[in-house]
Amino acid sequence: MKIIKYKKGSKGKYKVFLDDDRELILYEDVILKYNLLLSKELDEKTMIELDKYNQECDVYYTALNSINNRFKSVYELKQNLIKKEYPKDLVDKAIDKLLQQGYLNDRIFAKSYINNQIITTNKGPYKIMKELADKKIDSDIINEEIELFTVEEQTERIKKLINKGIKTNHNRGGIVLKQKIYNDLKLAGYDINLINSVICEYSFENDSVIAKKEYEKLYRKYSRKYSGSELERIIKEKLYQKGLKYEKE
């Protein structure tokens, strides 16, 4: 078999025409490695080698495009390639090559991920650490890089979230409001000792003004359907759910 023509395609590929009417789609890397010039003779053994190396290039460039679209951990990238049903040996080879070239690096990934989460979310350190662990980042790397999220920054973030919680839940009583904010911060991944040290700076006393306003609002809502002791019972239940208590003068 002899090469009679080339046609440049997209994404670094070429269509190679042979004199037996066969056409090959090969990466430029393959053409350069095997010095595939016009009129070059190809035997079946070489054809097998070309196909194997072309597959290798395909896995590598698919992996490279994947991390160019979004930086990934080694585990994430490997799972991505396995889902595409590439042979495991070629996947491992591509990943090793990317590691050697510096395109893959779990420490750099962890650092970038943590910075991004700090800037774009309200997540606490434990939640971020859990997400990195799910991406199979080494625990030593996680523990070292999470130091980027300083206690000072966490404290300021907790204060911001407490203020927001107070503002958006202004119709709740002090005890219920404090517990809700505490639970929200814990779920967000903040350290409970740090939460307690910050939250104790705030006053969460029951506010009689809030209770009165809520009572009047509930009265207007339910007095159209209930009256007397039944109406009072329903209003008291609703107030209790909000951590409020109000006795009419």
Where are these regions (language model features)?
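An alpha-helical, amphipathic repeat domain used for nucleic-acid recognition
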Residues: 1-249
